[in-house]
Amino acid sequence: MTTRKPFIICDFDGTITMNDNIINIMKTFAPPEWMALKDGVLSKTLSIKEGVGRMFGLLPSSLKEEITSFVLEDAKIREGFREFVAFINEHEIPFYVISGGMDFFVYPLLEGIVEKDRIYCNHASFDNDYIHIDWPHSCKGTCSNQCGCCKPSVIHELSEPNQYIIMIGDSVTDVEAAKLSDLCFARDYLLNECREQNLNHLPYQDFYEIRKEIENVKEVQEWLQNKNAGESSLK
């Protein structure tokens, strides 16, 4: 029987980082109107693309440096993430960060941890009076949810047939990707969704837990054994 190669995708805000950076930006800089937009996204009466786009549209572009400095100082990387990335790199397990966040904070926060070509996120433009969001990874094919950064579309683009897909996330932006995964590591909003929709999942608090559980996954164990056997035969 052919071994199913593991393939890991990971959210950024609230998953790799301890808090949701977009929410913290809005709490600090946005006028009160952002709350109704957030509630619309969470209740799914607004698409993620529309809701998040309109939230950032409330912020003057003149705040670029202030917002950037704030989020880079405020964000904290979740415990065990650096070690987790080192583990998957050592064993050559495909790993991508697919984020509904913005390039001006996702890239610098992951610098030196995850290569830029393994990060998919949105682009914030500060060229006009108010921040405008560009969506370079919009929905394709059968997805019509107006995801913004469409995680299902990116998964279809990057993954190969018969891979064992592992999803790590926390929020409403991760639900559709979780439905495509063989195993979802979930917390917060996503954990409740996984329970309600009977998706195969495990809860987590940090990446030490995730690594421990991943090493117990049959497909990962088989991949590591085959890889180690191949390396031994070359010695």
Swiss-Prot record:
| Matching Pfam families | HAD (PF12710)
Q: Which transformation does this protein catalyse, written as a reaction? A: 2-hydroxy-5-methylsulfanyl-3-oxopent-1-enyl phosphate + H2O = 1,2-dihydroxy-5-(methylsulfanyl)pent-1-en-3-one + phosphate
Gene3D superfamilies recorded? 3.90.1470.20, HAD superfamily/HAD-like
Q: Which GO terms describe its molecular function?
A: 2-hydroxy-3-keto-5-methylthiopentenyl-1-phosphate phosphatase activity; 5'-nucleotidase activity
Q: What class of enzyme is it?
A: hydrolase
Q: Which InterPro entries match?
A: HAD-like_hydrolase_phosphatase (IPR050849), HAD-like_sf (IPR036412), HAD-SF_hydro_IB_MtnX (IPR017718), HAD_hydro_PyrdxlP_Pase-like (IPR006384), HAD_sf (IPR023214)
Pathway assignment? Amino-acid biosynthesis; L-methionine biosynthesis via salvage pathway; L-methionine from S-methyl-5-thio-alpha-D-ribose 1-phosphate: step 4/6
Single GO cellular component term:
cytoplasm
Extract the NCBIfam families matched here. Answer: DKMTPPase-SF, HAD-SF-IB, PRK09552.1, salvage_mtnX
Its biological purpose is as follows: Dephosphorylates 2-hydroxy-3-keto-5-methylthiopentenyl-1-phosphate (HK-MTPenyl-1-P) yielding 1,2-dihydroxy-3-keto-5-methylthiopentene (DHK-MTPene).
Which family does the entry's similarity section mention? Belongs to the HAD-like hydrolase superfamily. MtnX family.
Please give the PANTHER family that the UniProt record associates with this protein.
Answer: PHOSPHORIC MONOESTER HYDROLASE, UPF0655 PROTEIN YCR015C
Q: What is this protein called?
A: 2-hydroxy-3-keto-5-methylthiopentenyl-1-phosphate phosphatase
**What is the species of this protein?**
Bacillus subtilis (strain 168)
This protein's encoding gene: mtnX
